[in-house]
Structures are given as C-alpha cells and as structure tokens.
C-alpha cells in the first residue's frame, strides 16, 4: 500500500512538473514570460556540436553512396548490421564484368587476338574488383565506423543532456515566475526555496552539458585522423588500379603493337556510307590539320611500318569505298598508316586496298 501511495505521488509530481514546463514554454513563446539565456560560450558549443552532427551525417551517408552505389545493397547491409550478422559476400561490378570478359574470350578462342585481349582485360577487372572490396572494408572500419559511433553514441548523449538542460531551464524560469506572483510571506519563502533548488540544478546541468560539448574538439581531432586513413586507403586503391591498367596496356600492346597507331594521334574521320562512291580528286577528309586524300589515292599513303600477313576471322562487308571487304579464313597483307584510328589497319589483297577493322584479323607473323 505504501509503495502504491509512493507511485501515485511520484506520478502526480511528474505530471505537475510537466504541466509547469508546458505553461512556461508556451508563455515564453507568447512573450508573456522571461527566459533565462545561456551564456555565450555554452551557446557557441551547442552550435558547434549541432554543426558537427549535421555535416558528419552528410559526409557519412555520401561516403556510403560512394563506396556502395547500389541502394538495395546498402539497405541489406544495414539490416544485417542491425541484426548483428555478417552480410553475405556478393560479387561486385568489376568482378562481374571481368568474369563476363573471361567467359567471352574463352568462347571466342584464347588463340584469337580479340579473345586473348578479353581474357587479359577480364583478369584485370577482377583484380580491380578485389581492390575495390579492400577499399570498402578499410574505409568502413577506419572512417565510417568512427563517424557512425559519434552520431549514434556521443551526439545522442549530448542531445540527451541538452534536453535535460532545457527542462532545468524551464523549471528555473517557472520558479522565478511563481516567486514574482507570490504575495503571502509563507508562499514567498516557499518560492524562494524552490528557486534556489532549481537554480542549483540548472547550474549543475549546464556544467555537465558544457563538459560534454567541450569534447567536440577532441572529436574533430579524431575524425581528422580517420580522414587521413580514408585518404590513404583511396590512394592505395587508385595506385593499385593504375598499376593494373598500366600492366594491362603493356600486355595488350605486346601482340598488335607494331600495327596499332598511337592512340594519342588524331583519328581520321570516316567517310559516311551514304556518300556517293564517286568522289572527286579534290575531295578530302581532314581533322585537326591531318589530311587524308580521296580513296583513289589510298595507294599513295606512306606506310609507317613493314607489312605483315593476317588471317581474316569473320566475313566483313565494307561500309564505304575507303574500306576493304573481307572473307573469313582468307589471308591478306596489312600495315599501319600514320594518323589512322587505332581500331583499323590498312589491308591489301592483290590490287585492292582499303581499311580493315583489326578485331576481324589474326596476325600471323
């Protein structure tokens, strides 16, 4: 029975306190009651904490998007994290592309130029996928986790104490209001006693909140170290990817390098197939100062390297008079020409000469 009485009294006291705070808050909003202002230093600390929370959330969320662009995958990882379970490993985009390239190259034939190149590209893409996975793991551990710990831990504590400070401030101002309205000596003495208690509780809560807020500077220093770790992880990732692509470029250049023009050279703009075949001797196609004469003068083009035999892999129908039609399994002579697009070679069969796509050829010697 005594316990029940205590609970009822406590409930009544809590309800009275809540009502008192609500009345004080409403009167302040209506300009009918005075409001105790926090000191400037504490206000600055509160603003700094709020600003830190807002930008930390934005940086954290956008970093998650950067590392995992797939929103469904992010939701799945979030659910597994809340269930305290490890998310199942999933193949990432570079790894999937790499596997497709390897499968395609195997089907086209590793002995063909295109098939060989696809397999090499696929292996490199899979290595990039592994590096991507390592970047995500390292960044999540060294960068995202500390940011999330601040949002879900430190800042929640700050917000809780800030709310308590707000309540203590309302209690203090309500006590001041009651003291002003007190007329009888007994009521005034009681109000003065209440004011001293609420003032003490407010000062104590303000000090607790201030100490917590001053830790924001340490949070910034910690997040700076985490940011350095993130930058280092990105630097390692991009350096790995650059090295992988550099090695791949060397491998791809090893078998057709003598017949591919420099990719940095200006490409020739192909003549559209809709143009008439009969082009005057004065007609020319030019890009950036590079001039290629009409098809009738193709034989006058200067070869930039020796000729070489190539076997045709597939039938090819010329799109216009500058190109040479091909039949599968026939052997033609090919050579490169200064300024020609890297995807093309000059082909020669008897008295016929024209551009041929390199992907349709297998170099023989």
Curated annotation (Swiss-Prot):
Which protein are we looking at? Endophilin-B1
Chief place where the protein resides: cytoplasm
Q: State the CDD domains in the record.
A: BAR_Endophilin_B1 (cd07616), SH3_Endophilin_B1 (cd11945)
Coiled-coil parts of chain: 155-195
Residue positions, PTM Phosphothreonine: 145
Q: Which Pfam families match?
A: BAR, SH3_9
Q: What is known of its domains?
A: An N-terminal amphipathic helix, the BAR domain and a second amphipathic helix inserted into helix 1 of the BAR domain (N-BAR domain) induce membrane curvature and bind curved membranes. The SH3 domain is required and sufficient for the interaction with UVRAG.
Its lineage opens with: Eukaryota, Metazoa, Chordata, Craniata, Vertebrata
Q: Which PANTHER family match?
A: ENDOPHILIN-B1, SH3 DOMAIN-CONTAINING
What does the entry state regarding organ or tissue expression? Highly expressed in heart, skeletal muscle, kidney and placenta. Detected at lower levels in brain, colon, thymus, spleen, liver, small intestine, lung and peripheral blood leukocytes.
Provide a Gene Ontology MF annotation, just one. identical protein binding
The places in or outside the cell where this protein is found are: Cytoplasm; Golgi apparatus membrane; Mitochondrion outer membrane; Cytoplasmic vesicle, Autophagosome membrane
Keywords on record = Acetylation, Apoptosis, Autophagy, Coiled coil, Cytoplasm, Cytoplasmic vesicle, Golgi apparatus, Lipid-binding, Membrane, Mitochondrion, Mitochondrion outer membrane, Phosphoprotein, SH3 domain
């Amino acid at each position: 029975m005594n316990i029940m009485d205590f609970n009822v009294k406590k409930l009544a006291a809590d309800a009275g306190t809540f009502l008192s705070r609500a009345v004080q808050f409403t009167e302040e909003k209506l300009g009918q009651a005075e409001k105790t202002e926090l000191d400037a230093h504490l206000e600055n600390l509160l603003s700094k904490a709020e600003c830190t929370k807002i930008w930390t959330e934005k940086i954290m969320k956008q970093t998650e998007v950067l590392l995992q662009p797939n929103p469904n995958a992010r939701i799945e990882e979030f659910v597994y994290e809340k269930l305290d379970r490890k998310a199942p490993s999933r193949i990432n985009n570079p790894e999937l592309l790499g596997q497709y390239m390897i499968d395609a190259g195997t089907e086209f034939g590793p002995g063909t130029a295109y098939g060989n190149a696809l397999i090499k590209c696929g292996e490199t893409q899979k290595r990039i996928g592994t590096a991507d996975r390592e970047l995500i793991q390292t960044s999540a551990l060294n960068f995202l986790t500390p940011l999330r710990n601040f949002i879900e831990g430190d800042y929640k504590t700050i917000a809780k104490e800030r709310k308590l400070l707000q309540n203590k401030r309302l209690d203090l101002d309500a006590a001041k209001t009651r003291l002003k309205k007190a007329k009888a000596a007994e009521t005034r003495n009681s109000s003065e006693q209440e004011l001293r208690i609420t003032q003490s509780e407010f000062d104590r809560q303000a000090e607790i909140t201030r100490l917590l807020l001053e830790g924001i500077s340490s949070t910034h220093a910690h997040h700076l170290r985490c940011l350095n770790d993130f930058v280092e992880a990105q630097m390692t990732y991009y350096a790995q990817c650059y090295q992988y692509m550099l090695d791949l470029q060397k491998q791809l250049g090893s078998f057709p390098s003598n017949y591919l023009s420099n990719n940095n050279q200006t490409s020739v703009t192909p003549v559209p197939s809709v143009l008439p075949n009969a082009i005057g001797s004065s007609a020319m196609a030019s890009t950036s100062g590079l001039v290629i004469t009409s098809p009738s003068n193709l034989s006058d083009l200067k070869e930039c390297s020796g000729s070489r035999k190539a076997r045709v892999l597939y039938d090819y129908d010329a799109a216009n008079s500058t190109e040479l039609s091909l039949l599968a399994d026939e052997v033609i002579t090919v050579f490169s020409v200064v300024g020609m697009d890297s995807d093309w070679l000059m082909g020669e069969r008897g008295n016929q000469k024209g551009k041929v796509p390199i992907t349709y050829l297998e170099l023989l010697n």
